[in-house]
From Swiss-Prot:
Cellular compartment(s): Cell membrane
A GO CC term assigned to this protein in UniProt: plasma membrane
Signal peptide (residue range): 1-22
Lipid attachment, kind S-diacylglycerol cysteine: 23
Assigned protein family: Belongs to the staphylococcal tandem lipoprotein family.
Domain of life: Bacteria
Residue positions of covalent lipid attachment, annotated as N-palmitoyl cysteine: 23
Protein known as: Uncharacterized lipoprotein SA2273
Predominant location: membrane
Length: 264
């Protein structure tokens, strides 16, 4: 009888330890997930910034990678990627480097086509058109004979100029993951076609599918902040081996010297 009571007590203690351990683990996971969501929210707070000139006065995260005299450079990029069944992956995107030291901004508009041959080799065809930004206007810096393309470039709007994530904190049922080895982290949320950002993308791009997209946020580097890491987001309407329809966007703040090397 005594032995039976001791055995029962022992089992109860083991179960209690497991329960407490499980609660501690879940608390840590929930805390980390909240931290990841908060990290993304800090980046998404810059949406919308309708006037790109405002980035000259926006301060980003600074760490030991920055020279004390360096005000830093913002890198913003937006692009639409479409691959119909059996076709090439075609994209039209723009990248802009906004130098806070010189208060100048330059970049390029990129038209890209990616195909895969029968042997599995990938082939890329890229065409870059250099641009600059002045008074919130995109201006080609080299002559463009194609008037339609010229207008497309001049009228280009980055997602940060019209996107809005004011309700991001209310997003629920997200799939949040974290890899401490890289470190990297991500969050995925299924959207609906009534979402403001989805409506804005459909208004500006020829998106053939009626399928509502999944919003995927990706980040790398220290969760507390790092100029070494990066943050990007995607609206994935269709993603598979045969067909792709997605929109990609990124805003990052980097040391200017590092960006000068990247542009050269």
């Amino acid at each position: 009888m005594i032995h039976s009571k001791k055995l029962t007590l022992g089992i109860c203690l083991v179960l209690l330890i497991i329960l407490i351990g499980g609660c501690i683990i879940m608390t840590k996971i929930n805390s980390r997930n909240a931290q990841i969501k908060d990290t993304f929210n800090q980046t998404l707070n810059v949406y919308p910034t309708k006037n790109l000139d405002d980035f000259y006065d926006k301060e980003g995260f600074r760490d030991q990678e920055f020279d004390k005299r360096d005000k830093g450079t913002w890198i913003i990029n937006s692009g639409m990627y479409i691959q119909l069944k059996g076709g090439a992956l075609k994209s039209r995107a723009m990248v802009l480097y906004i130098n806070r030291n010189t208060r100048t901004a330059k970049g390029y508009f990129l038209i890209s086509e990616t195909t895969e041959d029968k042997k599995g080799y990938v082939h890329n065809k890229d065409k870059k058109y250099p641009v600059k930004m002045e008074r919130n206007r995109i201006i080609p810096t080299k002559p463009i004979t194609d008037e339609k393309l010229k207008k497309e470039i001049e009228n280009f709007k980055f997602f940060v100029q019209y996107g809005n994530f004011k309700d991001f904190k209310d997003y629920k049922d997200g799939d949040i993951s974290y890899n401490p080895n890289v470190p990297s982290y991500s969050a995925k949320y299924q959207l609906n076609n009534d979402d403001y950002n989805v409506q804005q993308l459909r208004k500006r791009y020829d998106i053939s599918t009626k399928r509502a997209p999944e919003l995927k946020l990706r980040g790398s580097g220290d969760l507390k902040g790092s100029s070494v890491g990066s943050k990007e987001l995607e609206f994935n309407f269709v993603r598979n081996k045969e067909e792709n329809v997605y929109f990609s966007d990124g805003i990052n703040f980097k040391p200017t010297e590092e960006m000068n090397h990247e542009q050269n």
